[in-house]
Amino acid sequence: MEDGDYLVIAETPVSVSQGRLVDESRYSPSLKAKFLTTVWSKYLWGYVFGPILGIKKRTIKNLRRLPKETYAHKEVVLQLYGLKHALKPASEAGIDLSNAPGSCVSLLPENPQKVAKQLKAEIGKNVCVMIIDTDATYKKNGKYFTGLPIAIDGIEANKGVIGYVKGQLGENMGSTPLGCSENISVEEGLKIANIAEDYQKSLATEMSTIHSVKSVLGTDESSVTIEALDSITHTPAVILSLIHI
């Protein structure tokens, strides 16, 4: 890395390094979790709200085939993040289901801004370190916001389902910068985050959702092992360099 470079890191490896893994098999689904999974997410969002708001066809397809095994996931969201995040039909609170083994999931990292600054100090060069999440930041009426619990300054965070619904009526700005070692503008943060995310999406081993697991690893979502995850090449970080013409 050289002075002026950007180091863009996906949130999951940071979370794992902090021990922020949760085993969903240890959670007993409540009636509320079952209702939110089946009636609210699968049927109301899959067949009514989703099509009306024009959410991605891929998301609608995935909602319509939600299995009963996701009851425990919704219970985790309810207990750890509350109803406003559990009401979101998918990708609740930025919890990552696709890059963890077995019934484990990865929560968002704790204090990503502090982590970004620590990493910059360890690198020892004048670089910008950014931690991002693929969940969207939206823009409406000149304001940036996200349903995620955390984001860089300038993006209103922790909006939960309200942010998700409002976002469908606004502009999707792409991936969300969670923390940054520098005080950068929201516009710059979004630009850099999306360049890195576009590169990661171009890779054959990219698993954007839990439903990508079977095509990449050749195994069911519930059968992911550490060995299976180790069998593919991961790209948890991307280095971006400015080219001066």
Which functions belong to the PLM regions below?
Residues 2-5, 123-134, 193-235:
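Flexible, glycine/charged-enriched surface loops at secondary-structure junctions
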Residues 243-245:
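Conserved small/polar residues in nucleotide/adenosyl-binding loops
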Residues 157, 161-222:
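A two-mode feature
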Residues 52-125:
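Internal, conserved structured core segments that host functional sites
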Residues 20-58:
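Active-site cofactor/substrate anionic-group-binding motifs, chiefly glycine-
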Residues 25-34, 77, 132-163:
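Composition-driven recognition of glycine/serine/threonine/acidic- and proline-rich low-complexity segments
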Residues 2-30:
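N-terminal low-complexity or amphipathic/hydrophobic leaders
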Residues 1-3, 14, 30, 37-38, ...:
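Disulfide-rich extracellular domains of secreted proteins
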